[in-house]
Amino acid sequence: MDKQAAERRIQELHKEINRHNYLYYVEDRPEINDAEYDLLLRELQQLEKAYPDLVTADSPTQRVGAAPLEKFSQVTHRMPMLSLENAFNEEEMHDFDERIKRFLGLAAGDEIEYVCEPKMDGLAVELVYENGDFTVGSTRGDGYVGEDVTQNLRTVKTIPLSLAIATPPRLFEVRGEVYLGLAPFQKLNVEREEAGDPPFANPRNAAAGSLRQLDSRITARRPLSIFCYAAGSLEGHEFTSQSDLLNTIPGWGLPVNPLIRKVSGIGGVLAYYHEMSEKRESLPYEIDGVVVKVDSFDLQRELGEKTRSPRWAIAWKFPPRQAVTVVEEIVPQVGRTGVITPVAHLRPVEVSGVMVSRATLHNWEEMEKKDIRKGDTVVVERAGDVIPAVVKVITEKRKGDEQPLPIPANCPECGSEVVKIPGEVAVRCLGLSCPAQIRETIIHFASRHAMDIDGMGDKYIEQLLKLGLVKNVADLYYLKKDDFMRFERMGDKLAENLLGAIETSKQRELSRFIYALGIRHVGEHTAKLLANAFGSMENLEHASEEELLSIREVGPQVAQSIRTFFHNRNNIEVIDRMFNAGVKPSVEEKRVGGRFTGKTFVFTGALTRFTRDDAKRMVENEGGHAAGSVSKKTDFVVAGAEAGSKLDKARQLGVKVLTEDEFLAMLGVCRT
């Protein structure tokens, strides 16, 4: 290919890859699978390698991160990024509304048009676009001067490197909130704890810590996202209102929270706040309140600013998700990788409608830093963690008999030596045959998202270990009915059901099998990437580090962990024993041209004909996409019993609603 043809193809690839990035990261409705995406990216990389002078700053290949910086330089904001005044109750919101009316000379009965937005709990940033190209990105800082984090922001997949508009503004400063979703946050903390690093306290700290990395390659490995919500300086374009801005910029490629809404009067604001308060627990990211802004930019200019905040906006904060209780015991808990975690057993207390009786203390360094002891009165919080965390000790309530828990010299499960590896915060059991590690490994292997051995719960696994019937996951596939009949209160039918569930699990998808192996740093998503890339266990076992690193989202740490796992002879022997017992993982290809190609489904309510995981698989196998929330882009909502807000929204948007039987009929499955 000559240079002219290469340049044309590079431009085509830019457009195609950017479009797929937008579909994948912003709209959550990919049109191609990861393997097809990787082929496009690899083609672009090869062309740029052949013609390095054709590499442009907005190329999709330039998101991988640059060499580490020694320190961040400073950026002065052309327009200050002011903080917002806070409100904490309805009375203060009524006061805000009345102040605006008085300032504008309006009558008490007049209604202001407001725009209400979920208050994201992340890190505020400013993106500068010059003639449509992203040139500078900075943190809010003190509102006047922030830190230059351009290289890090370039790695955030939801930030366009160039605006999708034919005639872009000469200058456009857009403000937004960089955040980390709850699922990526929990996964990141698991990986950090397994690697011996301190976990992040909450998603906001994780987002801030990820964005303020001097090495942007670290930022690139963390799935940060952004929602844009305001404009700074603007030349060459004009918006008339906040709603005009937020309705326009998604078409330019800038993500906006779909829950933003224009309302009339303070009554509309109150209704929106209470709706978001109810939705808060079901959202895939953290919000800590609602931001309310006067919609009209003319009115905003008339209202102006106070010393540190605008008169035309306010943040109505949610009540904190905290409670006070007592630490009744601190117990060391051994995980499947040998990491020993101190866990606080608490006097039961309700936090955000959930009864809490345990909280992770993460590690001994964290516990000692907070000085948490048995008998302490503490503040606990639910902030993105499945298991709540202890925020602080109320030291003034100490009586003098509180007891700290020292690092155990020996594993509480097997008595093996316990070590703290230099450079890590984790304390680990070195026992190769530690029953706690074996137990947790088998529980993980049999779990619903792994091999899904129906009925094989924790109690049965503990009995198998106690009776010496299993020593590793391969032993599950050599069990006989007589083995289960040794259990307490075990009948013929139940034993046969368990054996049947084990037999059924032999045909699970390759991605589930990879995830079930419990390879360090390999979660469900990475397991799917590996299954799609290599297609068989044999190929994965023999994959080189270079081949692993060529996969999108697989970094050096993950690649090294995979290589280490497959270099362990014991692991290979366990896998071989499973294959000899008839385990045969299958690769389920996403069908191109399936009956659901290009269609988006949402499942809601209590499903009786299939599980949500089964539904997602059925849709994806037919080329469709299963989403978690209803939007204008949703094609079908499948509603089970007691369907709630998703069903209501589907009806409001005119989305077609199906029963479970109607969905199965679309698949050609007979009703029973």
UniProtKB/Swiss-Prot annotation:
Gene Ontology annotations for the cellular component aspect, listed alphabetically: cytosol
Residues at the active site: 119
Catalysed reaction equations from the record: NAD(+) + (deoxyribonucleotide)n-3'-hydroxyl + 5'-phospho-(deoxyribonucleotide)m = (deoxyribonucleotide)n+m + AMP + beta-nicotinamide D-nucleotide
Domain BRCT as annotated: residue spans: 591-672
EC number(s) per entry: 6.5.1.2
Record-level Gene Ontology MF annotations: DNA binding; DNA ligase (NAD+) activity; metal ion binding
Listed InterPro entries: BRCT_dom, BRCT_dom_sf, DisA/LigA_HHH, DNA_ligase, DNA_ligase_AS, DNA_ligase_CS, DNAligase_adenylation, DNAligase_N
Disulfide partners: none
Keyword line: DNA damage, DNA repair, DNA replication, Ligase, Magnesium, Manganese, Metal-binding, NAD, Zinc
Binding site for Zn(2+): 411, 414, 429, 434
Enzyme type, top EC level: ligase
GO biological process: DNA repair; DNA replication
Residues binding NAD(+): 34-38, 83-84, 117, 140, 177, 293, 317
Required cofactor(s): Mg(2+); Mn(2+)
Cited function: DNA ligase that catalyzes the formation of phosphodiester linkages between 5'-phosphoryl and 3'-hydroxyl groups in double-stranded DNA using NAD as a coenzyme and as the energy source for the reaction. It is essential for DNA replication and repair of damaged DNA.
Family: Belongs to the NAD-dependent DNA ligase family. LigA subfamily.
Record's protein name: DNA ligase
